Amino acid sequence: MKRICSIYKSPRKNEMYLYVLKADGLERVPEGLLPFFGTPVHAFDLVLSPERKLAREDITKVLENLESQGYHLQMPPLEDEYIEHLPEELLRRNDPV
């Protein structure tokens, strides 16, 4: 099953995205979500199918959410996922002996 999807980015949270079916637009997005998300900014349109790979989302879950609730919300990554941790020896370099 292929779906044409519009993807919107949040002006409030970096790396937060809202996926909706292009034909529906934002009609099925709950009103309570928009104050949290902010005014959606259209990023791009995409054809989704079960074979397609997404960088940070499970395509099966995205397609299920689009069918069942009319949208999919992609949350920003957790801090641990994008912060590079320094080796212990570098962290202690300036410690007093």
Curated annotation (Swiss-Prot):
Gene3D superfamilies to which the protein is assigned, alphabetical: YcgL domain (3.10.510.20)
Regions that span the bilayer: none
Pfam families reported in the protein's UniProt record: YcgL
Every YcgL domain range: 3-87
HAMAP family per the UniProt record, alphabetical: UPF0745 (MF_01866)
PANTHER family documented for this protein: PROTEIN YCGL
Name assigned to this protein: YcgL domain-containing protein Pput_1298
Organism: Pseudomonas putida (strain ATCC 700007 / DSM 6899 / JCM 31910 / BCRC 17059 / LMG 24140 / F1)
